[in-house]
């Protein structure tokens, strides 16, 4: 059910309507799209565009600030959209995956913006890479960027900042715990209920398998998927986060 393609503005006119253009070499992989009636909704609060479908889903972005021609490294921009629990639509599942390194960072930023607008989902970023935040603000879409979730705040102050710090040990552990919990509950067969979890994006699964918490740089899809899961959390998990320093999410099996 996964389709590759790109999101484009209708007739090339920004801020109108986003369309999905199927392309076997497209940068996006998509397993589900919202019904036509809730796509491309332009909603404003206090004269600012905001995400209209935040109760349905959220996104996570592992961004970069330097153009590929300047940086030259292999790290990609990664992006996931995730559906929360819902009675009508696919629930507790990733519906979009993106891992690409366009030559200009702003192409990546605009890709994220178009998909977020099409779905109407807010996205959570790492605030140590602020290029994407500045871009969204310049385009009038900073209302689509989530503030730091309250349950991930280390202070009791009401200071609101876009995104979360990637160098915080509390955030790093919460991020890893969110992925481990998701895999346990929603990937493969749930031994307690017998239900089969659905995860359509093999590149993300492979990224989870190889993930090393002490060397997170190479695992772009793990970072963005974990940010989406953190964005979907309503409150701080009651279970104490595990120590992931010597842990893998998925065990490797040599047998076929």
Model-identified regions with their sequence ranges:
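RNase H-like, metal-dependent nuclease domains and their acidic two-metal-ion catalytic environment used
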Residues: 1-148, 185-256
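Short alpha-helix plus adjacent loop in nuclease-associated cores
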Residues: 145-189
């Amino acid at each position: 059910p996964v389709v590759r393609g790109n999101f484009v503005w209708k007739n090339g006119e920004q801020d109108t309507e986003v369309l999905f253009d199927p392309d076997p070499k497209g940068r996006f992989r998509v397993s589900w799209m919202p019904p036509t009636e809730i796509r491309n909704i332009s909603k404003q609060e206090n004269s600012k565009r905001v995400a209209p479908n935040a109760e349905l889903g959220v996104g996570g972005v592992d961004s970069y600030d330097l153009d590929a021609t300047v940086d030259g490294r292999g790290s990609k921009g990664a992006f996931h959209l995730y559906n929360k629990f819902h009675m009508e639509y696919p629930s507790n599942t990733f519906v979009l995956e993106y891992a690409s390194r366009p030559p200009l960072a702003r192409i990546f930023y605009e890709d994220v913006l178009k998909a977020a607008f099409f779905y109407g989902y807010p996205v959570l970023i790492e605030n140590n890479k602020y290029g994407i935040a500045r871009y969204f603000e310049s385009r009038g879409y900073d209302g689509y960027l989530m503030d730091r979730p309250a349950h991930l705040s280390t202070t009791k102050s009401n200071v609101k900042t876009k995104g979360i710090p990637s160098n915080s040990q509390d955030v790093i552990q919460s991020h890893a715990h969110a992925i481990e919990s998701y895999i346990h509950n929603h990937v493969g067969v749930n031994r307690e209920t017998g239900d089969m979890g659905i995860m359509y994006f093999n590149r993300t699964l492979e990224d989870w398998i190889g993930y090393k918490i002490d060397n997170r740089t190479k695992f772009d899809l793990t970072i963005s998927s974990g940010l989406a899961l953190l964005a979907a959390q309503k409150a701080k998990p009651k279970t104490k986060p595990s120590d992931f320093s010597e842990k893998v999410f998925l065990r490797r099996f040599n047998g076929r």
